[in-house]
């Protein structure tokens, strides 16, 4: 390799492209740090309040739902980002198709979860907890907007939404502890965080002068996405 080729292959740290990706990565790291910090502080507070038994029940319900939640996401995350990067003009078609696929997947996940709880003869209280928590899969459908900002290397919008919803839900958890709330309310707040996420993504999408009403479902696109993503679903469950 010539000296000129070597120079050309070096990273241009002063380029706009590098600055854009560096800033994007910094936003992602910042969100992870904030999430870990808040989860640690509030988590200890909540665990001490609930105690081993109640916290165990809540964790079990969340994990139980998690087994079926992968069906709702359909393993489409990286696939959709790839397609949006490849052809940004298909934005409404891709986001619309994935949105409706995730709605269908969420309904299937909810049905399978509830049926399984009865087959396993779970207690009434466990079924109630699981039934509340599994509704979060429906609200995760609008999170497809996250893929759009990932593809545009604008993760700051995702960080705004995710951090805001986390902070609000954490404050509510602290208030629940303060007012001696029952375990059911903590399950409701778990779902509320996803509701806040959906609302937040809707807002940032609208702020960027984009409309969800423009989304459209295209069967050929949906089939193509599922064909590419299905190998990722099983590993996600396991």
Where are the model-predicted features located?
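Interhelical loop/hinge segments that connect adjacent transmembrane helices in multipass membrane
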Residues: 2-17, 21, 156, 183-187, ...
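Signature of the first transmembrane helix
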Residues: 3, 17-77, 110, 114, ...
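Transmembrane-helix boundary and interhelical linker motifs in polytopic inner-membrane proteins
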Residues: 11-20, 50-54, 68-103, 150-157
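Membrane-interface helix-capping segments at transmembrane helix termini in multi-pass transporters
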Residues: 15, 47-61, 86-97, 108-138, ...
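Alpha-helical transmembrane segments of integral membrane proteins
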Residues: 19, 23, 27, 96, ...
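Interfacial helix-capping/hinge residues at the ends of transmembrane alpha-helices
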Residues: 43-44, 77-82, 143-146, 150, ...
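Alpha-helical transmembrane segments of multi-pass membrane proteins
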Residues: 67, 71, 103, 107, ...
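Hydrophobic alpha-helical transmembrane segments
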Residues: 130-134, 160-207, 224-228
